């Protein structure tokens, strides 16, 4: 069927073919993240929404997941504390919202957003020390 072909293509794209018969619980964190992205894309969404896509991954795993997330020509909306991911030009992130206390505190370009976020964290840390 068309859906099986699409899933096969996604598994090939995300280098999951060799683990296609494994249970998700048997996969390492990186493969589970990639499987979640592939599963979402199997429904042909117009956008991908991800919460902390690199959480719990080492630097290499986080890079693989981020590359996968941004490699499928879909709009990506995600929440993260991973400022390295936001800074990477190859992901072509064009807009970043920084939230503070459940409200938008900054809306703009990645580099400025990272600087704002880092300053915000620094100010909160300094205030907590007092």
What are the residue ranges of the model-derived segments?
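H-loop/switch region of ABC-family ATPase nucleotide-binding domains
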Residues: 79-83
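Conserved ABC ATPase "signature" region
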Residues: 2-19
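Catalytic Walker B motif of ABC-type/P-loop ATPase nucleotide-binding domains
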Residues: 48-52
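Conserved ABC ATPase signature
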Residues: 23-27
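Conserved D-loop/post-Walker B switch-helix segment of ABC ATPase nucleotide-binding domains
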Residues: 55-67
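Conserved beta-strand-loop-alpha-helix hinge in the C-terminal portion
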Residues: 103-126
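Hydrophobic anchor residue at the start of the ABC signature
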Residues: 37
């Amino acid at each position: 069927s068309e859906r099986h072909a699409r899933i096969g293509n996604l598994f090939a794209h995300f280098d999951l073919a060799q683990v296609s018969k494994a249970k998700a619980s048997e996969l390492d964190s990186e493969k589970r993240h990639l499987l979640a992205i592939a599963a979402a894309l199997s429904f042909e969404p117009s956008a991908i929404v991800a919460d902390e896509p690199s959480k719990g991954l080492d630097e290499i795993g986080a890079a693989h997941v981020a590359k996968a997330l941004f490699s499928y020509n879909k709009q990506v909306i995600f929440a993260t504390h991973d400022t390295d991911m936001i800074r990477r030009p190859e992901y072509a992130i064009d807009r970043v919202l920084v939230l503070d206390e459940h409200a938008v505190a900054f809306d703009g370009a990645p580099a400025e957003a990272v600087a704002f976020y880092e300053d915000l964290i620094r100010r909160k840390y300094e205030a907590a020390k007092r």
